[in-house]
Amino acid sequence: MIETDVLVIGGGPAGSSAAKHAALGGAKVILLDKRSEIGAPKRCAEGVSKKGLAKLGIEPSPRWITKEIDGVRLTSPDGTDVWLTEEEIELPEAGYILERKVFDKHMAMDAARAGAEIRIKTLATGMDKIEDGFIVSTESMGKTEEIKAKIVIAADGPEGHVARWAGLKGSAKAKEMESGVQYEMVNVEFDREAVIEFYFGSCAPGGYVWIFPKGDDIANVGLAILQHKATKPAIEYLDDFIAKCPATKNAQAVELNVGGDPVGGMPKKMYDDNILVCGDAAGQVNPLTGGGIISGMTGGMYAGQVAAEAIKEGDHSKKFLKKYDKITRDDLSHEIDKYKKVQEYMLTLSDEELDNIAHAFQDVNFEKISTTELVKALVKVSPKALLKLGKFI
């Protein structure tokens, strides 16, 4: 039987962040990933903020950045555009479009450089509680092994099993799981190629369509919907949008990505004896945008740091590990809760109301733009928004 201090299950950005920081803290760490290649297939639109990377101490690298973003375009159902570009306003949440296949791999490499052992093509198939830890059953290329860990960090995504194996609730109920589908496309025709575009309304019930540029004529074009608000599968909404949108009507798909996005917020408990949960598995996702790379890596960082402290102290109990829950909520919960309320408000809006807001935004003088500033502007132009969101500004 293999023994380790910390076993991280899931090699996405959150898991690699957890493994890296646990190893930096002096713990013996193993990181498992079921895929044969970390980072593939990608399952997101690949956007991150510069501020978020800086907070995590990650230096931007041309190896995994495909485009620097200097603006945002918001489009309502009737085609009214709200342009928010760096030429006119400050963009504190400006960022990059990544190449996730490369980024994720480099984050795993950082974990390895910190001292973590990485095992690819290794699936966790079960987990049994023992007196002070877990025994995790694994399967890799026809070979079965058991790993005994003092602390398990579950970073196995929104459909993961590890937290539930430990008796914890998952990150999202079915109705709070967005269905996402995306093409990487070529021959996309941009009005401005360094601007990310969002389209709202019945084109994507309960969510939105995005166009994220990755090159001169290359973009991620996708959408996320709440299936209980929809009348057909997500892929049909996306294909309909692509056929009608001037930017994409002549484009060709070279890659298809699908996945679920938990937008219900963090569960009540992300820890127990000998276990921590982070990333999408812990609902560490912005409910409004569905973005979870930076927040998931932040949760992973805290999980790794607290796990390493617990190993040093020889205390792997839920009483000690609760520290992770507190630190993470202190950092992330205000933003997640706020954007959950905005998302719930957006779900109440008809196409006509979205158009009216876009028309009203034409007269708003933005000095800087972030998601928070957009919420403030929304409250100014919509009395309905003031009632629901006023306390968050």
From Swiss-Prot:
Q: Which GO terms describe its molecular function?
A: flavin adenine dinucleotide binding; geranylgeranyl reductase activity; oxidoreductase activity, acting on the CH-CH group of donors, NAD or NADP as acceptor
**Alphabetical UniProt keywords:** FAD, Flavoprotein, Lipid biosynthesis, Lipid metabolism, Oxidoreductase, Phospholipid biosynthesis, Phospholipid metabolism
GO biological process terms on file = glycerophospholipid biosynthetic process; membrane lipid biosynthetic process
Q: Which residues cross the membrane?
A: none
* EC number(s) given by UniProt: 1.3.-.-
GO cellular component terms, A-Z: membrane
Disulfide bonds listed in the record: none
Catalytic reaction equation(s): a 2,3-bis-O-phytanyl-sn-glycerol 1-phospholipid + 8 A = a 2,3-bis-O-(geranylgeranyl)-sn-glycerol 1-phospholipid + 8 AH2; 2,3-bis-O-(phytanyl)-sn-glycerol 1-phosphate + 8 A = 2,3-bis-O-(geranylgeranyl)-sn-glycerol 1-phosphate + 8 AH2; CDP-2,3-bis-O-(geranylgeranyl)-sn-glycerol + 8 AH2 = CDP-2,3-bis-O-(phytanyl)-sn-glycerol + 8 A; archaetidylserine + 8 AH2 = 2,3-bis-O-phytanyl-sn-glycero-3-phospho-L-serine + 8 A
The cofactor(s) it depends on are:
FAD
Under the heading PANTHER family, the entry gives: DIGERANYLGERANYLGLYCEROPHOSPHOLIPID REDUCTASE, GERANYLGERANYL DIPHOSPHATE REDUCTASE
The protein's job, in short, is: Is involved in the reduction of 2,3-digeranylgeranylglycerophospholipids (unsaturated archaeols) into 2,3-diphytanylglycerophospholipids (saturated archaeols) in the biosynthesis of archaeal membrane lipids. Catalyzes the formation of archaetidic acid (2,3-di-O-phytanyl-sn-glyceryl phosphate) from 2,3-di-O-geranylgeranylglyceryl phosphate (DGGGP) via the hydrogenation of each double bond of the isoprenoid chains.
In its miscellaneous comment, the UniProt entry states: Reduction reaction proceeds via syn addition of hydrogen for double bonds.
Q: Hey, which family's this protein in?
A: Belongs to the geranylgeranyl reductase family. DGGGPL reductase subfamily.
HAMAP family the record matches: DGGGPL_reductase (MF_01287)
Name of the featured protein: Digeranylgeranylglycerophospholipid reductase
**Organism encoding this protein:** Methanobrevibacter smithii (strain ATCC 35061 / DSM 861 / OCM 144 / PS)
